[in-house]
Amino acid sequence: WKVQHNILHHTYTNITGHDEDIHPVGILRFSPNEKLKGIHRFQHLYAWFFYGLMTIQWLTTKDFRGLKRYNDMGFVKTGYKKEFIKLVFWKIIYLGYVLALPMIFVDNFSFIEIIVGFLSMHFIAGLILGLIFQPAHVMETSEFPMPNQDMTIENTWAVHQMNNTANFGNKNFFLNWYAGGLNFQI
């Protein structure tokens, strides 16, 4: 999270090839700088399903791939093996209290019901995260600058953030409460 969000996303917001938040699975396209494929014309129909899988992807693959990639980039300062063990440990703890404890101590639900509940919770969480985070950066007013030959962009970091971030639903009391203010990005 520190590397992916705080360093890469907030330093390189909406810069293709650097901001992982605008480079999802190949079937989705968030940046006009990404290659346009025929399937993308239906993205408005199927994106919701992939948003719903977001937290399952984090749990199963994204964190592991990210750790490897960030180690290769030199961001992992405490040692790859140590961070990998910590990552596996915390995923086991999470799965233990979210899946194993209910299976052991809750008699009212079957194994299948607990798994369906777990997957439903993750699907809804991913959908909510997608619905809150995408409007903050992937709007018609957002810019998607490409670095020049010197690997720089023309604006300062602060101006770049203002040009690539959007508030939404500012006057919607329920959305403000529900999103915890995440709809106020600027």
What is the meaning of each model-derived region?
Residues 1-79, 148-186:
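Membrane-embedded catalytic scaffold of the fatty acid hydroxylase/desaturase
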Residues 90, 136-137, 185:
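Generic beta-strand/beta-sheet core signal
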Residues 37, 80-84, 110, 137, ...:
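Intrinsic-disorder/low-complexity, polar/charged segments
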Residues 44-56, 79-132:
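Alpha-helical bilayer-embedded segments of polytopic membrane proteins, i.e.
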